[in-house]
């Protein structure tokens, strides 16, 4: 049974951090690694898409205590949990979809998204990435930490399974429910380049 995205995470808030750190492969490695790639200059402006409870920020703020972070998430409960962790930090939190929230122009030194963007098609991502590109300052960059489909067939299978479940439950295409539909690295790269990013580096 598919669940609406915000409700899915709110229903799992208790124990969420522990699940992410112990139940997701290599989480103890990719959260610190992601944080190490973010800017550390005093007052760096960082946008966190789908920030949840701020697990990546737990690793980032020790590296840049003066960072000014804007976090966007669908779940108000998740953001409230994040807020309690960082009462002394410069954080602006926005409840909403990062597809809909205005981001401005030349605002951020970097943007980051961890385990959040694997729910969307390439065509859905391109307008978002264009908006992100506009919101980044000169020499700004996006860090995307996520998992990807190994093959085109796997990517399409995820999408087909989602469409079948939506049809079974009578869910419209414009309704946002939780189901993983990761792209291949190649398709993700194509989306970023089409959106205007000059290059894509895969570690």
Regions found by a protein language model. Give the residues of each.
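Class I SAM-dependent methyltransferase SAM/SAH-binding core
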Residues: 47-49, 53-100
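C-terminal alpha-helical "lid/dimerization" subdomain adjacent to the S-adenosyl-L-methionine
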Residues: 145-195, 200-201
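A short glycine-rich, Lys/Arg-flanked "PGG" loop and its adjoining helix->strand segment in the class I
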Residues: 126-138
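A short acidic, Gly/Pro-enriched loop at the edge of an enzyme's catalytic core
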Residues: 103-111
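A short His-aromatic
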Residues: 118-120
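A short beta-strand submotif of the Rossmann-like class I SAM-dependent methyltransferase core
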Residues: 113-116
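Conserved class I S-adenosyl-L-methionine
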Residues: 1-40, 55
């Amino acid at each position: 049974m598919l669940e609406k995205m915000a409700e899915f995470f709110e229903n799992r808030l208790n124990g969420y951090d522990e699940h992410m750190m112990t139940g997701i492969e290599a989480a103890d490695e990719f959260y610190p690694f992601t944080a190490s790639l973010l800017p550390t200059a005093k007052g760096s402006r960082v946008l966190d898409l789908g920030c949840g409870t701020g697990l990546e920020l737990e690793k980032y703020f020790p590296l840049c205590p003066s960072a000014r972070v804007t976090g966007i998430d669908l779940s108000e409960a998740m953001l409230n949990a994040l807020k309690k962790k960082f009462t002394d930090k410069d954080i602006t939190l926005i409840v909403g979809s990062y597809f809909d929230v205005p981001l401005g122009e030349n605002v951020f030194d970097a943007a980051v998204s961890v385990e959040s963007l694997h729910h969307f098609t390439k065509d859905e991502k391109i307008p978002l990435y264009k908006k992100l590109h506009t919101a980044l300052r000169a020499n700004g960059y996006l860090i995307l930490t996520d998992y990807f489909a190994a093959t085109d067939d796997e990517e399409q299978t995820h999408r087909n399974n989602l469409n079948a479940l939506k049809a079974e439950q009578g869910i419209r295409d414009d309704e946002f429910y939780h189901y993983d539909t990761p792209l291949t690295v190649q398709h993700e790269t194509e989306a970023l380049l089409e959106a205007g990013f000059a290059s894509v580096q895969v570690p």
